[in-house]
């Protein structure tokens, strides 16, 4: 079937995105600012300063690894703000306490997330495996809060600021400068609470409070420009600001003293917890917490942890983080395996497997944007804004065939969660069901997605009416562009931004069936890698969402015939290429799988470094084409019994 067309965002004849706006100017926001450094920037490779090897089989490694982290933390920063990485050699590391990064510019890197890589084995008392946090108690930047009495507030004078706007007007620009970090503070009033119909929440005969009047919804932004009394923001606002409901008291505050960790990362690790078949209130082991700015985590497999991944701050990327929960969670109150709280957060090519859990749940008052891109969820869990007015969530090409997506009013659930999310989008998703509701004065959109719409009443108010249904646009028919985030990123920063985050150039491919076939992932060799060790090639590939690894022969010995991937200039192709050398040695003749000293010669292309089916995603009626170019040198002689020139898995 041909791709559908959204009424709300579509490409015109020149390929430029066109946005439909409401009568008041609200529109789907530009989500492309989510991610490390504001989106479209390659996750950095930070050279290792120290390498750590496993201790004895059951010996605790916490202090051993932490000492290495502390030593690197004491090094001076380079021009890019990095001190260095601690590299964990392959092996199993028993840890009974958290590993903590508390200083800017430090990276903890393993040697792979599969069982033969670097494995953190959790034991001991309740703790999180890895924590990135400077230990300073601070505002998350995007939260419900109360104004400090000594802060200078500047009045915002607009009568209405639509969702998606980059601009606002203030009474006085003196003292403001381009580059200032600011907070836009929207007061919560009794008038607004009543308008949202959140003033009558009751549970078990007791009144419940949604958001207390006098609190503030706070959006953290940076000043990109000043035009008269108009402030141009670096990132659009993901909520509307109506002076009628704020008592004309929305304010702007300069917040240049936010003290967060910066330029920290966690990479290429496996975290293993004992099975936790308990209520999440009794959970012992959590995988990762990152509270910072311009930080990242990538290529991490977390097994049997609970409430696994928590993020706070802004401009953070999580890439290829996989959470696998096979021990069934007990109880009605469920853990959230991804809890992204803050702004400009990108969760890219991640996955969760488990039942009776929240795949994703946001905290209160988050003011985004928060993006889940090409993520997969296996089980009966759901994705929610969850509670107390979080805005600006994009689910882009997310696949949860057994679960659901909810943009809804939770009423008196929890302690009065009420309206959980607004101004949020599910774009070209697949889910079993959607609860898409529309809060007063706002929108939620489900566009180009497949799955059943399930209208509901407000919980604990079953005699009340079914709540208004949000926008379902081109339902059951995927729309172009295939990815909203990637299309917005390309329009804002160009093709190079897509390649920088591992999605490569988008070019038309011929097809006898489909005219709208596009290539969305690719990799070419970089001349900068010529002559470098294969580990540099490995990191380059992983930064683009690919992978390369050298494996010993089945006897588990190291390669005695050299490294088998390098980058060089090919005179025939007139470009830099990856050169793969197949094993061929009389000491290791080809044979059947598993024989001692056998060496199955191969170069493989896989959907992921593990074998879980859901890492290679596709939508109904979507064609997929995978191709690569290679040249076999003249005189190439494979051995006679077994040889893979290229293998696609």
Give each language-model segment a name.
Residues 512-649:
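Low-complexity, Ser/Thr/Pro/Gly-rich disordered linker/stalk regions
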Residues 87-89, 94, 100, 107-109, ...:
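Extracellular beta-strand solenoid repeats
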Residues 124-144, 148-149, 165, 244-256, ...:
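Extracellular beta-strand/beta-solenoid scaffold signature
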Residues 105, 110, 180, 186-220, 224-230, 262-349, ...:
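Right-handed parallel beta-helix
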Residues 372-511:
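Gly/Ser/Thr/Ala-enriched C-terminal appendages of enzymes
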Residues 1-276, 447-513:
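Extracellular "leader-to-stem" segments immediately downstream of a signal peptide or signal-anchor
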């Amino acid at each position: 079937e041909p791709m559908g067309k959204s009424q709300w965002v579509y490409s015109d004849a020149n390929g430029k995105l066109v946005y439909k706006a409401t009568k008041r100017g609200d529109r789907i926001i530009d989500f492309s600012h989510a991610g490390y450094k504001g989106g479209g920037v390659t996750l950095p490779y930070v050279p290792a300063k120290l390498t750590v090897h496993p201790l004895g089989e059951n010996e605790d490694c916490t202090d051993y690894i932490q000492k290495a982290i502390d030593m690197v933390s004491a090094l001076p920063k380079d021009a890019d703000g990095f001190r260095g990485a601690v590299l964990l050699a392959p092996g199993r590391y028993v840890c009974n306490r958290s590993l903590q990064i508390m200083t800017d510019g430090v990276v903890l890197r393993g040697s792979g997330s599969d069982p033969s890589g670097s494995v953190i084995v959790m034991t001991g008392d309740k703790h999180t495996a890895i924590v990135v946090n400077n230990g300073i108690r601070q505002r998350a930047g995007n939260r419900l809060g109360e104004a400090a009495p000594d802060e200078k507030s500047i009045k915002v004078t607009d009568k209405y600021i639509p969702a998606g706007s980059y601009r606002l007007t203030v009474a006085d620009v003196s003292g403001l400068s381009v580059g200032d970090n600011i907070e836009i503070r929207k007061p919560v009033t009794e008038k607004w609470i009543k308008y949202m119909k959140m003033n009558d929440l009751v549970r078990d005969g007791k009144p419940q409070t949604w958001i207390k009047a006098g609190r503030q919804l706070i959006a953290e932004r940076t000043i990109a420009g000043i035009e008269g009394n108009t402030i141009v923001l670096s990132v659009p606002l993901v909520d509307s600001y109506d002076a009628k409901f704020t008592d004309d008291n929305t304010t702007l505050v300069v917040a240049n003293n936010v003290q967060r960790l910066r330029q920290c990362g966690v990479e290429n690790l496996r975290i293993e917890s004992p099975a936790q078949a308990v209520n999440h209130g009794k959970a012992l082991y959590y995988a990762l917490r990152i509270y910072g700015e311009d930080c990242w985590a990538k290529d991490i497999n977390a097994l049997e942890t609970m409430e696994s991944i928590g993020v706070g701050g802004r401009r953070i990327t999580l890439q290829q983080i996989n959470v696998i929960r096979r021990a069934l969670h007990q109880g009605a109150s469920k853990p959230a395996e991804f809890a992204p709280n803050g702004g400009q957060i990108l969760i890219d090519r991640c996955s969760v497997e488990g039942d009776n859990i929240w795949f994703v749940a946001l905290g209160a008052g988050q003011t985004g944007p928060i993006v889940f891109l090409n993520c997969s969820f296996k089980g009966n869990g759901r994705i929610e804004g969850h509670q107390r007015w979080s805005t600006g969530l994009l689910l882009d090409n997310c696949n949860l065939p057994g679960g659901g997506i909810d943009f809804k009013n939770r009423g008196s659930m929890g302690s009065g969660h009420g309206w959980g999310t607004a101004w949020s989008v599910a774009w070209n998703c697949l889910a079993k069901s959607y609860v898409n509701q529309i809060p007063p004065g706002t929108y939620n959109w489900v566009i180009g997605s497949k799955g059943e719409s399930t209208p509901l009443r407000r919980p604990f108010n079953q005699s009340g009416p079914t709540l208004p249904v949000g926008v379902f646009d081109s339902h059951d028919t995927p729309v172009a562009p295939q990815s909203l985030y990637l299309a917005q990123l390309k329009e804002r920063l160009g093709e190079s931004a897509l390649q920088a985050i591992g999605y490569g150039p988008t070019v038309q491919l011929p097809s006898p069936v489909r005219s709208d076939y596009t290539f969305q992932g690719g990799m070419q060799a970089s001349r900068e890698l010529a002559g470098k060790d294969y580990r540099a090639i490995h990191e380059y590939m992983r930064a683009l969402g690919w992978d390369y690894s050298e494996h010993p022969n089945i006897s588990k010995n190291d390669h005695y015939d050299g490294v088998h991937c390098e980058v060089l200039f090919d005179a025939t192709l007139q470009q830099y290429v990856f050169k793969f050398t197949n094993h061929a040695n009389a000491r290791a003749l080809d044979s059947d799988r598993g024989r001692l000293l056998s060496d199955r010669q191969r170069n493989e292309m896989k959907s992921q470094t593990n074998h879980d089916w859901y890492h290679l995603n596709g939508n109904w009626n979507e064609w997929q084409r995978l191709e690569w170019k290679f040249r076999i040198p003249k005189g190439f002689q494979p051995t006679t019994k077994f040889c893979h020139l290229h293998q696609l898995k």
